[in-house]
Amino acid sequence: MPGNHWYDILKKIACEGSSDIDELKGIFEKELSKRKFDSIRNIEDLIDVLERADMLSLHNVEPLRKMSSHKPKLIEALDRYGTPVSAPREPVNIYQEERLAEELRQHLRISQAFQILSAPGVAPPAFIPAAAPTPPPPQQNYITPAAFTDRKRTAVFNKISEELGRFWRIFGRKAGIGEGTMDDIEERYPRDLKSRILHLLKLIEEDDCHDPRQLLMRLCRALTECGRNDIKRKVEQIMSH
């Protein structure tokens, strides 16, 4: 895995030479808020803004590649850097996992039984009882509206706001919150990360105010997609009690 040293070298190479900053800014115009876009005066500013928006990092240097069209030295350095870019994942309905796993286990049990009965030297029985139907998975009551009490809501929001940390923008983006809205939240709470995250959670809740189940699925999906499965499991644990 390339280290911070090589990542810093890439950024330094990107800043070398003369470039049309307006042309480079235009590449990211649709992805940045107007306030951030207008604050960019040079390549150093552009790189700083991209990093603050979690669009450029040690593990994702694709924005530098977009800026490299007239910089053969940067293209060569990026090719040597070799950071893989993860393909976007399909959204996963996490509440179907248990049911699908049980269906697979049942299928394997039936297949193994028929393999044994079909083996040489094994006499087939006069009657093979049909496999007992798989009972439906128990209802996950923790995602019903009645179970989403104020106490559990507070516990879920507190857990996410206490542990999400610097992932808050990626989480917000995965939950469908716009960059401009998150800029406003950051301006409102410049030094209070927990309040920033709580405000973000309330905005997400407002979108799903009549559907607690959808809200919880949206939160858990966003946690999964921003790489915080540890928090997702804690949220599910809170809701299961």
Swiss-Prot record:
PROSITE patterns: DEATH_DOMAIN. Its main location: cytoplasm. Signal peptide: none annotated. The keyword Cytoplasm applies. Keywords: Apoptosis, Cytoplasm. It holds the Pfam family Death. It is found in: Cytoplasm. Residues 151-237 form the Death domain. GO terms for biological process: apoptotic process; defense response to Gram-negative bacterium; signal transduction. Disulfide bonds: none annotated. Residues 1-101 are annotated as: Death-inducing. Transmembrane segments: none annotated. Gene3D superfamilies: Death Domain, Fas. GO terms for cellular component: cytoplasm. The keyword Ribosomal protein does not apply. It comes from the Eukaryota. Component of the IMD signaling pathway and is required for the host defense against Gram-negative bacteria. Interacts with Dredd, promotes cleavage of Dredd and is necessary and sufficient for enhancing Dredd-induced apoptosis. N-terminus interacts with Dredd. Interacts with imd. This is Fas-associated death domain protein. It comes from Drosophila pseudoobscura pseudoobscura. The gene is Fadd.
